[in-house]
Structures are given as structure tokens and as C-alpha cells.
């Protein structure tokens, strides 16, 4: 359906269409539209919808005679058309040569009065390519139902991120992404499951987790002793480094950090926590160590005393070895935090230790391990400018990912608190609604047409995501697929993947898996 005609055009600044809609509410930001040029179809996104200032409108507003003398939108006055009309600013995304069907970047403009219409399913099918490793993420905003797909193989080749404020649906989006990765066999995933979202069933909304859909591909370990079905997680304290404690505690002063490193130098094979507790000024004998710093460090280290999973093991073989064995078999791992899910210190502590040990192995013996995507929630806690020097594993992962099969995936609501260096390495960004201008700007740093996308991101509704990067043909606003059993089976798993028998067996023990009865 024709919605208007082009009245201004610029390769740099975009197009302006005079709308012929009776109601401008029919058109919204980020809707895809087609401008029919002489040779090309211009695939565009709506950047803005506006009613320009009008002296006549100013004079008539509030007048008792306005309803009598103002022509309705459908009423034309001679050759000039309606007196009052709306306009739309359009951003050109792709050109489609109508003769050859080839796609190209916008390097020209359509003629004056070129017709503008809503994009149809046929239009978008010409734009998006589907590969053997593509998986559905949702439908395109403003188009009759068309399921748009991401190339999961390309997605997991380089670092990527899911950004969005709290409550926008990041967990649901991430479950769809993980399901896509596993269904296409392009890699395994390691998820630090803080809130019981990814195992068999979600503890919050009871939706299905990864173990439900991929019972033979996913192992679950748990920090919480009440989870009787998952394998217990044990961490040998001898594996702890000063950096692990600095990242976990987050509030060590510079003198405390200096003291910690001094103590670590002389631990002689003992675990660092016990060594700190037993340290004294007499033993240290260092001018750099002060009594107040030592006592403050001991008090903070005492926070770890309540963690039941810190246990020395035979030959130092803790749960990391179980995780490694699963990864070697191309399995994915969900680490359930159970009752520790609300404890930020525990999350930072465990995630940093396991990630560091994985990084060391992958960089030393890269050829031995399959591709693994490491999902990091609350990423800014590890990657802020203040902590990043100590959590150097993640900074190096972002910078040097092409050398290994270990890929960093960030999930965060405050991208502005992630260091510029790390954000600059992201090849794909899945950006949901953000309200803080600094977060919007940070999430889109380095993105073409940044100003347009800033406006779109700030106004995205819930469960909607802007996908920008090389895993999709063009930047796209997507209504995220409703996450349920039927949709995941139909649009992501396909035929022959779902093991009904195994799932039914797992489902019988769902309550025990989470220990929540």
C-alpha cells in the first residue's frame, strides 16, 4: 500500500516522504518501508515521523471554529494536496536492483515523487539470507509475519553482546540465542546461571531451559547443596589467585591489594585464603605492609568462610575438571548458583576463576578444545576501567579472540561501564531498550548511522531488539520470538532434534533439579 512520496533526498542525510496516510499513527519508528525508484527499490527504515510547524495550525489550535474550516486529511485543495499532512524521515539501508536482484549499499537517491510503501514479506525475503547455520530470533517489526534469522556460526566467531535495561527480556533473548547455537552445532556454551533460568525449567517463569530441549548436550552443576539432581560444584582454594579475590571483593583499597600480593609471594603452595588468615606483620616483615591494611584484608577475606563449595581435593581435581571433560565432548554446561544467585560476590568470584582457568587452557592448547561461548552476565563488574586491570582474562578474550576457540558473550544493562577497549571488539550487538543516554551511546559506539539508532534504541518497546553486526545481512529491529515449547521446537529446533523420551524423564525430576519442591 502506498503511504507517501519522496519530497527530499540525500545519500548522507536520508530521505523525506510526504505521507498520504489518513492517520500518521499507522507508521512507527523502525518500520521497514520500500521507496520505488526508477531502477532500484530502496529498502529503508523509518527514522522519524513528524508534523512540521504550521502557522495556520498555530492560529487554529484551540479555536472554536477549527472543526468547521479545517479540511480533513483526506480533503484535497487543488493540486497542492491536503493543507495538513505528516512527513517521515527514512534511512536508506539497502538498494535492490529490480533487474538483477543484486543488493548494494546506498550510494544514490530516488527521484522526486518516488512512491513509498510498507515493506512486504516478498521485499524482506529478498534482503535476508538463510544459511544452514541460521536460527530464528523473532519477527520483523512492521511487516506481516516474517521470521528473521541470525547466522549462528558467524555470531560465535567473534565477541558479541546483549545489552538492555532490567526487565526488557534479556534472559529470554539469551535463551533463544543459546538454543540457536546448540541446535546448529556451531559451539558449546558455558552459562553462569545466577537465577535458575537455563537448566531444565526457569525458576522464575517456569519456561523451559536448555537441558529441557537438549538433554544430551547440556550438563548441570550447582553451587547449592540443595540441588540433588545436578552434580555438586567444588572449587579447590589452592587455585585462587590475588586477582580472583580483587575482582570478587571489589572493595579492596590500594594498600590492601599491595598487602595481598606480598602475602601471595610467600604462600609456598598453600591456598591463598588460609595464608592471608595466618599472616602477621612479623612473618611478612615488609615495609609496604601496614597493620591496618592487613587487618582490613583479613576481614574481607572472611566473607568467603561461608562458601560450602570451597574444598581441597585430591590432586587438585575440582569441578573444573568435570566442566573441562564436558567441553571436550562438545557439551554445554549450566552452572546453577541456586541460593547463591543473589550474592554478587560469589558470582564474581566463581565466574572469574573458571573463566581464567579456561582461558589459560585454551591459549596454551587451543587445538584440543572445541569452540566454547562464555556468557558473562553483569559484564561491567568485570570490565569496568577500575577492575579490568585485574580481570585481564576478559579484556584479553575480547582483544585476541581470533586466536582461540573461546568466545566472550557479554550480557549487561550498563554498557557505558564497560571499557571502551572491550566494546570496540564486539562484532555483533543485540541491543534492547536502554534509557540512560550514556548507555545508549556506549552500546552503539562505532555503529554506522549511530544517531538514528540512538533514537530507535531509546524508544524500543519491551521484548524488542535491534540486531547490528555481521551475523545478519542488515541492521534490523526484531520482535523477539515468544519463548515457549512450541515456538522453540517449530522455529529453532526443527524436526529430528527434540528427544521426547529424555525430556519426559528429566521433567519428572524438575523440582528436585532446582531443590525448590
Region spans (language model):
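Basic- and hydrophobic-enriched, low-structure N-terminal and domain-boundary segments
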Residues: 1-163, 173-177, 368-370
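Conserved catalytic network of the ASCE P-loop NTPase/AAA+ motor domain
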Residues: 154-155, 181-185, 212-213, 325-327, ...
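Conserved ATP-driven motor cores of ASCE-family P-loop NTPases powering translocation/secretion/packaging/pilus
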Residues: 79, 396-481
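Conserved nucleotide-binding/hydrolysis micro-motifs of P-loop NTPases
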Residues: 40, 50-52, 94-97, 195-199, ...
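Glycine-rich phosphate-binding loop of nucleotide-binding enzymes
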Residues: 134-222, 467, 488, 497-499, ...
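P-loop NTPase motor domains
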Residues: 196-208, 221-398, 403, 465-471
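Conserved P-loop NTPase motor module
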Residues: 461-517
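Hydrophobic residues in beta-strands of the RecA-like P-loop NTPase core, especially within AAA+ ATPase
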Residues: 192, 376, 411-412
Amino acid at each position: 500500500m502506498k503511504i507517501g512520496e519522496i519530497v527530499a533526498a540525500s545519500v548522507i542525510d536520508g530521505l523525506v516522504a510526504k505521507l498520504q496516510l489518513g492517520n500518521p499513527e499507522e507508521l512507527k519508528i523502525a518500520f521497514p518501508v520500500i521507496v520505488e525508484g526508477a531502477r532500484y527499490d530502496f529498502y529503508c527504515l523509518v527514522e522519524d515521523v513528524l508534523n512540521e510547524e504550521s502557522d495556520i495550525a498555530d492560529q487554529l489550535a484551540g479555536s472554536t471554529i477549527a472543526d468547521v474550516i479545517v479540511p480533513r486529511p483526506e480533503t484535497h485543495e487543488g493540486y497542492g494536496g491536503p493543507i495538513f499532512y505528516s512527513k517521515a524521515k527514512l534511512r536508506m539501508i539497502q538498494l535492490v536492483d529490480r533487474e538483477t536482484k543484486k543488493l548494494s549499499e546506498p550510494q544514490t537517491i530516488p527521484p522526486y515523487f518516488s512512491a513509498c510503501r510498507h515493506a512486504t514479506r516478498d521485499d524482506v525475503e529478498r534482503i535476508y539470507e538463510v544459511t544452514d547455520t541460521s536460527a530464528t530470533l523473532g519477527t520483523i517489526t512492521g511487516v506481516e509475519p516474517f521470521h528473521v534469522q541470525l547466522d549462528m556460526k558467524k555470531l560465535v566467531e567473534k565477541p558479541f553482546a546483549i545489552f538492555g535495561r532490567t526487565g526488557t527480556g534479556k534472559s529470554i533473548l539469551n535463551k533463544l540465542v543459546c538454543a540457536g547455537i546448540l541446535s546448529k552445532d556451531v559451539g558449546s556454551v558455558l552459562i553462569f546461571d545466577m537465577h535458575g533460568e537455563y537448566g531444565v525449567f526457569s525458576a522464575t517463569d517456569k519456561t523451559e531451559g536448555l537441558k529441557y530441549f537438549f538433554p544430551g548436550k547440556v550438563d548441570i552443576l550447582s553451587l547449592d547443596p540443595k540441588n540433588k539432581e545436578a552434580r555438586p560444584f567444588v572449587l579447590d582454594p589452592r587455585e585462587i589467585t590475588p586477582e580472583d579475590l580483587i575482582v570478587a571483593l571489589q572493595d579492596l583499597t590500594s594498600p590492601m591489594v599491595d598487602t595481598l600480593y606480598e602475602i601471595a609471594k610467600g604462600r609456598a603452595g598453600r591456598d591463598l585464603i588460609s595464608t592471608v588468615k595466618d599472616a602477621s606483620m612479623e612473618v611478612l616483615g615488609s615495609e609496604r605492609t601496614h597493620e591496618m591494611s592487613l587487618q582490613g584484608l583479613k576481614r574481607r577475606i572472611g566473607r568467603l568462610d561461608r562458601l560450602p563449595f570451597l574444598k581441597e581435593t585430591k590432586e587438585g581435581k575440582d569441578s573444573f575438571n568435570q566442566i573441562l571433560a564436558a567441553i571436550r565432548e562438545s557439551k554445554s554446561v549450566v552452572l546453577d548458583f541456586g541460593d547463591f544467585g543473589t550474592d554478587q560476590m560469589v558470582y564474581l568470584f566463581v565466574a572469574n576463576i573458571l573463566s581464567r582457568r579456561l582461558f589459560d587452557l585454551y591459549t596454551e592448547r587451543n587445538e584440543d578444545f572445541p569452540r566454547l561461548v562464555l556468557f558473562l552476565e553483569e559484564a561491567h563488574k568485570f570490565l569496568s576501567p577500575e577492575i579490568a586491570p585485574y580481570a585481564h582474562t576478559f579484556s584479553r578474550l575480547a582483544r585476541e579472540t581470533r586466536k582461540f576457540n573461546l568466545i566472550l558473550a557479554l550480557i549487561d544493562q550498563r554498557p557505558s561501564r564497560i571499557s571502551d577497549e572491550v566494546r570496540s571488539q564486539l562484532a555483533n550487538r543485540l541491543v534492547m531498550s536502554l534509557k540512560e543516554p550514556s548507555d545508549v551511546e556506549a552500546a552503539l559506539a562505532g555503529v554506522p548511522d549511530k544517531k538514528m539508532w540512538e533514537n530507535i534504541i531509546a524508544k524500543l518497546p519491551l521484548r524488542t531488539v535491534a540486531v547490528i553486526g555481521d551475523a545478519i545481512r542488515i541492521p534490523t529491529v526484531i520482535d523477539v520470538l515468544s519463548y515457549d515449547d512450541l515456538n522453540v521446537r517449530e522455529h529453532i529446533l526443527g524436526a529430528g532434534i527434540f528427544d521426547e523420551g529424555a525430556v519426559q524423564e528429566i521433567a519428572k525430576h524438575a523440582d528436585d533439579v532446582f531443590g525448590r519442591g
